[in-house]
Amino acid sequence: MFISIEEKMNKLICEKKYSDIVSAPPQGLGATQTNLQRLLRSLDTVGWSTHEETGRLDRRAFTRFATGSANIFSRRQVAEAETSAVSILIDCSGSMEAGNRIRTAQSVVIHLSKILQRSRVPFCVQGFRTSGESVYNNDFHMERPKFIRFKQWGQSLQSVVAKLGAIDQCAGGGTPDYSSLVNALEDISKREESRKILFILTDASGYIPEHMKHVQKMADTLGVTLIAIGIHSVDAIDCFVNSSAVNDISELAG
């Protein structure tokens, strides 16, 4: 079910590639970062409850005190913020090799990962492609997906920089899109955070819109926000409700 890439990648080269991408953020990325951090950051909301009979004396309530009222105090209230978890799923099928699509996806993932790290949001990154195995019966044919764990839940970003730097070396094989998305949705739905977001980066080559509608219904049922980023293709826009397309990393800042 999983593909190991550690033995095949050159760690030093991959770490340098990661560093080169991080050191060259697209112009305007700061605005994207600010908007995403605002969405994801967990902040407690602090307020005050007035007209209390105990607590901190409310100086604005002196008029009520003069008329004999006892509810002249206020209390500090803290509303616990929503917490977020993010899963990033990368299409590593053979079509992503065309036109440097996988490299664009790699750049998007690395910059997105840095934003999530700064926001202190737990996240994972994995790629998917076929394993060469298929399941058949009288009603359907399904390709078994294989996943590439670039970053698992709980791992620090610093510990996986080489793996993220190796993303562009991992494209090949078929596209088990439906089964991979279902697996990723089920995985993030088990997280304890109140807000769950699944990003999929794909060229959507060969995707069937009707299948993706079923995936969207599943995401809605599980309470997961599904966001597609089309890579060098607008096909993702036809397949997913929340979607956009980029041809270059600079468009991420748009």
Set out the residue ranges of the language-model regions.
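Acidic, glycine-rich A-domain
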Residues: 1-254
